[in-house]
Design a protein with these regions (language model features):
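A conserved structural/catalytic subdomain of Rossmann-like adenosyl-cofactor enzymes
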Residues: 101-222
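Conserved S-adenosyl-L-methionine
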Residues: 2-109, 117-119, 135, 139, ...
Length: 222
Protein backbone atom coordinates (compact mmCIF):
# COMPACT_ATOMS: atom_id res chain seq x y z
CA UNK A 1 0.00 0.00 0.00
CA UNK A 2 1.26 3.42 -0.99
CA UNK A 3 0.62 5.02 2.41
CA UNK A 4 2.93 2.47 4.06
CA UNK A 5 5.69 2.69 1.44
CA UNK A 6 5.67 6.49 1.71
CA UNK A 7 5.72 6.32 5.50
CA UNK A 8 8.69 3.93 5.52
CA UNK A 9 10.69 6.14 3.15
CA UNK A 10 9.87 9.19 5.26
CA UNK A 11 11.05 7.41 8.42
CA UNK A 12 14.38 6.41 6.83
CA UNK A 13 14.64 9.90 5.31
CA UNK A 14 17.38 9.46 2.66
CA UNK A 15 19.23 12.72 2.02
CA UNK A 16 19.79 14.06 -1.50
CA UNK A 17 22.23 16.67 -0.28
CA UNK A 18 24.44 13.92 1.19
CA UNK A 19 23.85 11.85 -1.99
CA UNK A 20 22.72 8.90 0.13
CA UNK A 21 22.19 5.59 -1.65
CA UNK A 22 18.98 3.58 -1.30
CA UNK A 23 18.64 -0.11 -2.19
CA UNK A 24 15.63 -2.40 -2.39
CA UNK A 25 17.09 -5.91 -2.77
CA UNK A 26 13.66 -7.43 -3.54
CA UNK A 27 12.21 -4.48 -5.41
CA UNK A 28 9.25 -6.04 -7.26
CA UNK A 29 7.65 -3.39 -9.46
CA UNK A 30 9.52 -0.63 -7.64
CA UNK A 31 7.04 0.78 -5.12
CA UNK A 32 9.67 1.70 -2.51
CA UNK A 33 12.02 3.10 -5.16
CA UNK A 34 9.40 5.37 -6.72
CA UNK A 35 8.46 6.60 -3.23
CA UNK A 36 12.18 7.27 -2.65
CA UNK A 37 12.47 9.23 -5.92
CA UNK A 38 9.50 11.40 -4.91
CA UNK A 39 11.04 11.92 -1.45
CA UNK A 40 14.40 12.95 -2.97
CA UNK A 41 12.72 15.23 -5.52
CA UNK A 42 11.26 17.15 -2.61
CA UNK A 43 14.83 18.00 -1.58
CA UNK A 44 16.00 19.46 -4.92
CA UNK A 45 17.47 22.90 -4.29
CA UNK A 46 16.88 25.91 -6.55
CA UNK A 47 20.61 26.53 -6.77
CA UNK A 48 21.70 23.12 -8.01
CA UNK A 49 18.45 21.77 -9.46
CA UNK A 50 19.80 20.16 -12.65
CA UNK A 51 22.68 18.55 -10.78
CA UNK A 52 20.38 17.31 -8.02
CA UNK A 53 17.96 15.80 -10.52
CA UNK A 54 20.78 13.92 -12.22
CA UNK A 55 22.07 12.70 -8.85
CA UNK A 56 18.77 11.01 -7.99
CA UNK A 57 19.38 8.29 -10.61
CA UNK A 58 22.69 7.45 -8.89
CA UNK A 59 21.05 7.26 -5.45
CA UNK A 60 18.63 4.46 -6.37
CA UNK A 61 19.33 0.72 -6.66
CA UNK A 62 17.02 -2.23 -7.07
CA UNK A 63 17.33 -5.99 -7.56
CA UNK A 64 14.46 -8.23 -8.68
CA UNK A 65 14.64 -11.90 -9.62
CA UNK A 66 11.35 -12.30 -11.51
CA UNK A 67 11.28 -11.14 -15.11
CA UNK A 68 7.90 -9.40 -15.26
CA UNK A 69 8.20 -7.36 -12.03
CA UNK A 70 11.74 -6.39 -13.11
CA UNK A 71 10.43 -5.13 -16.45
CA UNK A 72 7.62 -3.23 -14.73
CA UNK A 73 10.09 -1.71 -12.29
CA UNK A 74 12.33 -0.48 -15.13
CA UNK A 75 9.25 1.05 -16.80
CA UNK A 76 8.22 2.59 -13.49
CA UNK A 77 11.66 4.22 -13.14
CA UNK A 78 11.35 5.70 -16.64
CA UNK A 79 7.92 7.10 -15.79
CA UNK A 80 9.53 8.73 -12.76
CA UNK A 81 12.14 10.59 -14.79
CA UNK A 82 15.02 8.10 -14.79
CA UNK A 83 15.91 7.76 -18.47
CA UNK A 84 18.29 4.81 -18.29
CA UNK A 85 17.39 2.64 -15.27
CA UNK A 86 20.55 0.54 -15.43
CA UNK A 87 20.63 0.33 -11.63
CA UNK A 88 17.64 -2.04 -11.57
CA UNK A 89 19.23 -5.48 -11.82
CA UNK A 90 17.50 -8.67 -12.89
CA UNK A 91 18.87 -11.41 -10.60
CA UNK A 92 18.27 -13.16 -7.28
CA UNK A 93 19.94 -11.15 -4.51
CA UNK A 94 20.23 -14.27 -2.35
CA UNK A 95 22.21 -16.36 -4.85
CA UNK A 96 25.14 -13.92 -4.87
CA UNK A 97 27.99 -15.70 -3.03
CA UNK A 98 28.53 -14.27 0.48
CA UNK A 99 32.10 -13.12 -0.22
CA UNK A 100 31.17 -11.42 -3.50
CA UNK A 101 29.43 -8.60 -1.64
CA UNK A 102 32.03 -5.83 -1.57
CA UNK A 103 32.35 -3.24 1.16
CA UNK A 104 32.39 -0.53 -1.51
CA UNK A 105 28.89 -1.58 -2.62
CA UNK A 106 27.30 -0.95 0.75
CA UNK A 107 24.47 1.55 0.84
CA UNK A 108 23.20 4.17 3.28
CA UNK A 109 19.61 2.90 3.28
CA UNK A 110 17.78 -0.37 2.60
CA UNK A 111 13.98 -0.20 2.31
CA UNK A 112 12.29 -3.46 1.38
CA UNK A 113 9.43 -5.92 1.71
CA UNK A 114 11.11 -9.29 1.12
CA UNK A 115 8.95 -12.29 0.14
CA UNK A 116 7.59 -14.13 3.21
CA UNK A 117 7.36 -17.84 3.70
CA UNK A 118 9.45 -18.75 0.68
CA UNK A 119 12.18 -21.37 0.82
CA UNK A 120 15.28 -20.89 -1.34
CA UNK A 121 16.69 -23.71 -3.48
CA UNK A 122 19.18 -26.24 -2.13
CA UNK A 123 22.63 -24.75 -1.80
CA UNK A 124 21.49 -21.12 -1.61
CA UNK A 125 22.83 -19.56 1.59
CA UNK A 126 25.26 -22.40 2.36
CA UNK A 127 27.99 -19.80 2.76
CA UNK A 128 26.07 -17.87 5.48
CA UNK A 129 27.54 -18.15 9.00
CA UNK A 130 26.54 -21.49 10.54
CA UNK A 131 24.41 -20.08 13.37
CA UNK A 132 22.19 -18.02 11.02
CA UNK A 133 22.16 -20.47 8.11
CA UNK A 134 18.62 -20.91 6.80
CA UNK A 135 16.75 -21.28 3.52
CA UNK A 136 13.80 -19.16 4.64
CA UNK A 137 13.72 -16.19 2.25
CA UNK A 138 12.77 -13.33 4.60
CA UNK A 139 15.31 -14.39 7.26
CA UNK A 140 18.07 -14.66 4.65
CA UNK A 141 17.31 -11.15 3.44
CA UNK A 142 17.48 -9.75 6.98
CA UNK A 143 20.88 -11.38 7.63
CA UNK A 144 22.19 -10.08 4.31
CA UNK A 145 20.94 -6.54 4.96
CA UNK A 146 22.59 -6.43 8.39
CA UNK A 147 25.87 -8.10 7.44
CA UNK A 148 26.54 -7.10 3.84
CA UNK A 149 24.25 -4.43 2.41
CA UNK A 150 24.22 -1.59 4.95
CA UNK A 151 27.03 0.84 5.71
CA UNK A 152 28.67 -0.14 9.01
CA UNK A 153 28.22 3.23 10.70
CA UNK A 154 24.76 4.69 10.51
CA UNK A 155 23.30 2.58 7.67
CA UNK A 156 19.51 2.66 8.03
CA UNK A 157 17.00 -0.09 7.34
CA UNK A 158 13.22 -0.30 7.04
CA UNK A 159 11.94 -3.83 6.43
CA UNK A 160 8.50 -5.46 6.37
CA UNK A 161 8.73 -8.80 8.19
CA UNK A 162 6.33 -11.51 9.41
CA UNK A 163 5.82 -12.34 13.10
CA UNK A 164 7.93 -15.48 12.73
CA UNK A 165 11.12 -13.50 12.28
CA UNK A 166 10.46 -11.56 15.48
CA UNK A 167 9.06 -14.25 17.73
CA UNK A 168 10.32 -17.51 16.21
CA UNK A 169 12.77 -19.91 17.82
CA UNK A 170 15.94 -21.65 16.67
CA UNK A 171 17.64 -19.92 13.74
CA UNK A 172 15.00 -17.16 13.77
CA UNK A 173 15.97 -16.23 17.34
CA UNK A 174 19.62 -16.08 16.26
CA UNK A 175 18.77 -13.87 13.29
CA UNK A 176 16.94 -11.49 15.63
CA UNK A 177 19.91 -11.56 18.04
CA UNK A 178 22.26 -10.67 15.16
CA UNK A 179 20.01 -7.74 14.20
CA UNK A 180 19.87 -6.45 17.78
CA UNK A 181 23.62 -6.80 18.37
CA UNK A 182 24.70 -5.11 15.14
CA UNK A 183 21.91 -2.55 14.90
CA UNK A 184 19.87 -0.20 17.01
CA UNK A 185 16.39 -1.64 16.35
CA UNK A 186 14.53 1.46 17.49
CA UNK A 187 10.96 0.99 16.21
CA UNK A 188 8.60 -1.90 15.47
CA UNK A 189 5.13 -1.13 14.11
CA UNK A 190 2.58 -3.94 14.12
CA UNK A 191 0.32 -3.79 11.07
CA UNK A 192 -3.30 -4.90 11.01
CA UNK A 193 -3.98 -8.25 9.30
CA UNK A 194 -4.25 -8.30 5.55
CA UNK A 195 -2.39 -5.07 4.81
CA UNK A 196 0.12 -6.80 2.58
CA UNK A 197 -1.68 -8.99 0.04
CA UNK A 198 -1.28 -11.85 -0.69
CA UNK A 199 -0.11 -12.53 2.89
CA UNK A 200 -3.56 -11.78 4.24
CA UNK A 201 -3.42 -14.21 7.15
CA UNK A 202 0.11 -13.38 8.26
CA UNK A 203 0.74 -10.76 10.91
CA UNK A 204 3.31 -8.30 9.60
CA UNK A 205 5.58 -5.74 11.21
CA UNK A 206 7.60 -2.76 10.07
CA UNK A 207 11.12 -2.78 11.52
CA UNK A 208 13.27 0.35 11.55
CA UNK A 209 16.92 0.10 12.55
CA UNK A 210 20.31 1.84 12.35
CA UNK A 211 23.55 -0.09 12.03
CA UNK A 212 26.58 0.51 14.22
CA UNK A 213 25.25 0.32 17.79
CA UNK A 214 23.43 -2.47 19.62
CA UNK A 215 19.75 -2.15 20.50
CA UNK A 216 18.78 -0.66 23.84
CA UNK A 217 15.19 0.64 23.73
CA UNK A 218 12.59 -0.45 21.19
CA UNK A 219 9.39 1.49 20.57
CA UNK A 220 6.72 -1.10 19.85
CA UNK A 221 3.50 0.25 18.34
CA UNK A 222 0.54 -2.06 18.08
Amino acid sequence: PRAITEFMVKMVNPSLKKRETVLDPACGTGGFLTATITHLEGQISKKSGAEDRKAIANCIRGIEKKQLPHLLCVTNMMLHGIDVPSMIEHRNTLTTPWNDWKRTERVNCVITNPPFGGIEDDGVGNDYHADVRTRETADMFLVLIVEKLLEDKGGRGAVVLPDGTLFGEGVKAKVKKLLMEKCQLHTIIRLPNGVFAPYTGIKTNLLFFTKGKPTDTIWFYE
